[in-house]
């Protein structure tokens, strides 16, 4: 499935995030419960190649954001090779691929993770830290590696327009990222109030049900009402 990430500046779609779904449309948790140590690498590779294939078949003209599992990547160059082959096969531009890693995912070796991210960047992929603020390691990871993008966790976003503590945290993250030249994406937007507060903070890339739900094997349309302030 694909969910749009919108750009409020010109009311366009900046990217689509590829989300895991089962063959019958089962949710991500149902699918991920079947992932084991034995099939983790194969699953990770299959997800990224299927995401690229699906995007090409849908004639996606935006960036494509793909989640990857750091613990499934043993040799970054092997994963990159298969990704490059998939992109070439389906004629999808390399510079429109974004790879997201979950800040909340337990990673045993952070040097390994930062090496993966650096190698991805060297090959022309954009990098992102997903669910930023959900775990305890986000700032440490940001200190070691500055991705192109971070995605604020929806727990920070929920009712942020009514919560002074969350507002202060979000403003602080935006300030830090501005100094580091890291673009902020707010995910999990579910209300006009959340959208408006975040826009006033200078966040222009957003994702969430307020704009569009994920579409299975399709590109979701953003309702015109979603933009109106």
What are the residue ranges of the model-derived segments?
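EAL-family c-di-GMP phosphodiesterase catalytic domain
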Residues: 7-12, 102-107, 136-229
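Non-membrane alpha-helical structural segments and their capping/turn regions in soluble enzymes
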Residues: 41-45, 77, 110, 114, ...
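Signature for phosphate-centric chemistry
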Residues: 24, 66, 131, 153, ...
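Generic structural signal for well-ordered alpha-helices
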Residues: 48-52, 80-87, 114-117, 170, ...
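Distinct, well-ordered alpha-helical segments
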Residues: 74-88, 108-116, 138-149
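Short beta-strand/loop segments at the ligand-binding rim of alpha/beta enzyme cores
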Residues: 116-129, 177-185
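Bacterial c-di-GMP phosphodiesterase EAL domain
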Residues: 1-90
